[in-house]
Every structure is written in C-alpha cells, then in structure tokens.
Amino acid sequence: AAFYVGVVTNAAFASIFAANEQRVLRDVRDHEVVHRDFFAAVLGSARIPNLTPNFSSVNFGDRNSVLETARTFEDLGVSAYNGAARYIANLTYLGIAGKIVSVEARHAAAIRDLLAPRTGSFAPKAFDDANSPQTVLNAADPFIVENITAINT
C-alpha cells in the first residue's frame, strides 16, 4: 500500500502516466489499502507492525522504474498468498485469502499489460509461483528497513 500511495502522490504522477494508467494505479492503491487495513483488523496484535518502507531504489519520476517495481510487488504478493495458503487453517480466512490473491493476480496482469501492452506478458505462466514466507520476506527485504524473519510457520 505504501508503494502505491507514494506512486499516486508523487509530483510526476500525472506527467508520466496517461489518464487510463493513472486510473489503474489509483485502483490498485485503493485495493492495497483495503488489504492492509483488513489484515491489521483481523490479525490485531499478531500482525507484523507497521514497517518503514525503503523505496530508495525506485525513481518515482520514471514510468518504467515505477512499473517494474509494481510488477515485482504484485508477482511477489501472488506468490506470497499462494505459498501461505497451506498455513491458513480457518476456512473463512482461507476463502478471503483466495479472494485477495485473485485480485493481486489481476493487479499483476494489469501492471504487466502497462509494461507490454497486448502481449503474452500479462500471464507468462500457466501456474503462478507459491513461495514460502521466508522466501517472500527475503525478496521484500530491499524495500523494508526493518529485518523480518518468519517463525512459527
């Protein structure tokens, strides 16, 4: 959520993205904020506390830098939900996770289409990755100041 908030509030946003692209990125931001707030409410004190993002590697004034980073986050999100499903014992929460991962997959496809319109890159594989929590955290590490380790999975 923090990444997309940064994208849409950046001074260059309106100049580097066409109107239809701005709409997509605002929608993705809105979805990610809902997901973040949902997890904060459901997990309560068991959630990962607020993290300090490190977006120093992202040039928010460059369309490709923003979209490449967005693709990284969306693909990582899909792999995180897919990998975490086996740890979710509560069927209600598993169903909700399934609903969220389907939205994340649409985000990934939309971002990929912005990068390479009307090509096969929107869904490059028949099956998405399913990564372990530690693999996901390792991939996210460059974008987070705090050190996070998966325990009790």
Would you name each region that the model predicts?
Residues 1-153:
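All-alpha RGS (Regulator of G-protein Signaling) helical domain and cognate RGS-like helical scaffolds
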